[in-house]
C-alpha cells in the first residue's frame, strides 16, 4: 500500500495575510464536504436514504462573497455516489481556485463504506489531483499529482492511520444519529489523500430560523462545535499559531424529518483575520418515497 505524506508550502511574512484568506476560504469547501447531511433514523435497520440531495452554498469571507459550493448525492439500493464543485475568487480576483470532488461506495444501514475518491483543483497554472482507493479495511492506494516528496518535518503516515477512515465525500454520510443531541456527538476519522485527521463534534446549542416560504420542517438549527485534530501528514509547527481556529469550527444542522436526514445550513471557520462562512442558498431533496422538498434561505 502506497502512503504519501502531505506537502506543506513555506511562506514569508509578506505572504501570510494572503495565505490566511486563502486557507480560510478553502477550509469552507473542505468543511462542507465533511458534513453535508446525515440520516436521521430510529435505527440503522430503518435507514431510508433519500434518492437524491442537491445543494448550493454561498462562501463568504469577512462578509464578502468569495465563491460557491455545489453538492449532489445519489442513492440506489445499497450504493451511493456524491459529487461536489467549488469556485473561490478572493482578494479582488487576485486569487482564484476551482475544485471538483467525487466519491462512491456502498451502504450498510446508515454506515458508508467508501470505494473510491477523487479531487481535482486548479489555482492559476497549478493543477493538483488526489485519487484514493479503498478496500474492506481502509485505504488501499493513493495517487497524487504532482507527486512531490513530503516535507521532512511532516508527521509520517503509518498504515494504522489509514484503517477504517472516510474520504471527505464518504464523511458526508458518516455523521448519522438517532436523536438531535447525537447529531453533534461524533468523532469522524478522515483521510484526504495527504493528511489524516479527526473531526470531533460536540453539541453547542440550538438556534431558531425563519424560512422564506413554509416548508413544513422544524424551523430550528442544531449547532455543532467541530474540533479539527491533526493525526499525521501535517507539520506540527503549522498548528502552533495557526491562522484558522481549528478548535472552534461550527456546523449548524437542520433536521428534515420528511426526508429522514439532517442538512447543514451554515458552516463557520474562524480565523485571525476574519471568519469564513458558508450558508445554504438552496437545498433540494427527493425523499425515498419521491416526495420533493425544497428549502430556500
Give residue ranges: language-model regions:
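N-terminal secretory signal peptides that target proteins for export/translocation
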Residues: 1-20
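An N-terminal domain-start capping segment
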Residues: 21, 114-115, 168-172
